[in-house]
Amino acid sequence: MEERYLKMMWELKPLGIIYTCNPSHCFMDLVEELSREIPVAIINNQNEKLNVDAVELDNSKLGRMMAKHLLELGHRKVAYIAPPLTTRQKQRSKRVEGFLKEFAEAGIKDQVIIKAAREELDLDVAHIDSEYKIGYELTRELLEETKDITAIVGLNDMIAFGILDALYEAKIKVPGDISVMGCDNTLFARMHKVELTTIEHFVIFKAVSYTHLR
């Protein structure tokens, strides 16, 4: 589908193209070639292999903000659950790195457990519920491995929903027994049976920033 739309852009020759997601790795050359003829900007995370304009998040800072919030609440032993931390998805790694840096500065980096899904998952076409399943399954594994964590962080809200449901099934109270945090502030973060602590990254401001690109 993505390839079809890119070829359509060649034919339509619009004044500009806004990519609201990261281009698939197999089409990056095509996107870059297209950008030589038509202005292209990505409103997402810049890929170092792709030479086009981008409006992106500082994911390292985002990770630090998440960690700082938990530290201020008194959490010391925490877990961080993420999708595969691959070179193709560097924004994931940067978010985790920022989180770890904040705990390192507090002198307790060794108290953070990082659980990331297998890299093979990134080779398949993602299912709509794949991130939810990552949060759910890795939380179940985590609960078998350790009993003394006080907070679990999901790299994004969908993972956090999986975390919440796994804890609910294990009869662990949130936030009474374990705190849960996500990131993205999706609509469902306010609709879940337990309102999710999350971080807003103001998508509308990204769009405004794009209009200022030259």
Where are these regions (language model features)?
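Bacterial carbohydrate/catabolite-sensing allosteric modules
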Residues: 3-13, 28, 35-42, 46-214
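Core AdoMet radical
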Residues: 15-17
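Structural motif
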Residues: 20-23, 83-84
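Beta-alpha junction/loop-to-helix N-cap segments that form part of ligand/metal-binding clefts
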Residues: 22-25, 34
